């Protein structure tokens, strides 16, 4: 059951009249309406549900088996189309086994999830895997978003390769939600570097053509550079390539590694210390800013970035993945720092030195 969380009688009635299932809370008891299923929850799961806000979306598979799909308090709500991908990135945070095992969600299920998201939701990320592997089914999902969430900003995370297919691209853009931004990775200035990371021959040229297609149609996109030991030294050259070919890029996000899945398996090939990754990105950042392209750091703790660049750092790590080292306990800037991936902190045993507030 997909459910809308309610504890107000009037809101519950409105949701039921609209044809939605309701996860109704009365005190610390829960039931799924209109099916009158009283949930027998463990104390741990009961506490998870008690922390939710009205109109959050929860999908139940059994009494104590559920996913919290949408939270009004979160800026990181995602609609996962599939975990399958047509690339095999050497530093993907998912394992290759996981990417191959997971099939696409059904179009009907994805559209039903969209219908439960509250109208007025500020943001939704559409992701995978590679969401365009859902082919024409993705068009129906976009149509559902257009109908139910016309004011929601949608970030579509894709490797951009399928966008090089002109017939598919032309069909896709006819279904895009009105407030759409594409997020596309570019790992290097040439096929040699980019394709060595995606481990997919021809992916660079497909991604570049997809970006050209977006730019030609005036559809906004951001570029993502996941920094590894393979491509770090080519960042400036990549920035020159971006400025010359894609001057309408809204922002270039420099992304630090999350050492899980394939990234952990290949850590000896891809890992680069955060402070070194930052130093290698300096000249590229200056070039992009001079070219009128915004820059942002994702997943970098403040202590690994020079103070003068802190305004570029985003708190980008999903809440449950954030960890702070023992060294961070008394850090004066902890509340504004994005922290570190728990997996990365565990795998690298990195030393974090708290900076002082000026």
Enumerate the language-model features and the residues they cover:
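Core AdoMet radical
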Residues: 93-106, 119-134, 146-165, 176-208, ...
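Conserved C-terminal portion of the radical SAM core fold
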Residues: 124, 179-183, 205-268, 276-302
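Distinct, well-ordered alpha-helical segments
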Residues: 136-143, 164-174, 233-241
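Flexible mid-to-C-terminal extensions adjoining Fe-S/redox cofactors in radical SAM and related proteins
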Residues: 306-358
């Amino acid at each position: 059951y997909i459910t809308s969380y309610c504890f107000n009688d009037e809101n519950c009635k409105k949701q039921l009249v609209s044809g939605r299932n309701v996860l109704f809370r009365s005190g610390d008891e829960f039931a799924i309406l209109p099916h009158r299923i009283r949930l027998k929850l463990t104390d741990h799961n009961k506490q998870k549900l008690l922390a939710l806000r009205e109109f959050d979306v929860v999908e139940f598979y059994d009494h104590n088996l559920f996913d919290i799909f949408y939270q009004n308090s979160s800026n990181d709500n995602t609609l996962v189309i599939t975990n399958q991908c047509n690339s095999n990135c050497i530093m993907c945070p998912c394992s290759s086994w996981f990417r191959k095992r997971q099939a696409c969600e059904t179009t009907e299920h994805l559209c039903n999830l969209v219908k439960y998201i509250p109208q007025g939701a500020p943001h939704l990320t559409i992701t995978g895997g590679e969401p365009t592997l859902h082919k024409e089914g993705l068009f129906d999902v976009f149509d559902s978003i257009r109908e139910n969430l016309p004011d929601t900003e949608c970030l579509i995370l894709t490797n951009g390769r399928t966008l090089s297919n002109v017939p598919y691209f032309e069909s896709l853009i006819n279904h895009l939600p009105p407030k759409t931004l594409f997020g596309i990775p570019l790992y290097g200035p040439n096929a040699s570097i980019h394709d060595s990371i995606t481990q997919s021959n021809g992916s660079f040229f497909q991604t570049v053509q997809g970006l050209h297609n977006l730019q030609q149609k005036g559809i906004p996109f951001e570029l993502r550079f996941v920094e590894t030991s393979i491509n770090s030294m080519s960042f400036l050259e990549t920035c020159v390539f971006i400025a010359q070919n894609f001057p309408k890029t809204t922002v270039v996000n420099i992304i630090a590694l999350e050492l899980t899945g394939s990234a952990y398996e290949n850590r000896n090939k891809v890992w680069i210390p955060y402070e070194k990754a930052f130093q290698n990105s300096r000249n590229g950042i200056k070039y992009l800013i001079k070219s009128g392209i915004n820059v942002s750091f994702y997943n970098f703790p403040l202590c690994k970035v020079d103070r003068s660049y802190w305004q570029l750092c985003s708190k980008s790590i999903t809440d449950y993945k954030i960890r702070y080292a023992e060294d961070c306990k008394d850090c004066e800037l902890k509340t504004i720092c994005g922290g570190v991936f728990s997996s990365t902190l565990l795998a690298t045993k990195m030393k974090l030195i708290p900076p002082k507030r000026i």
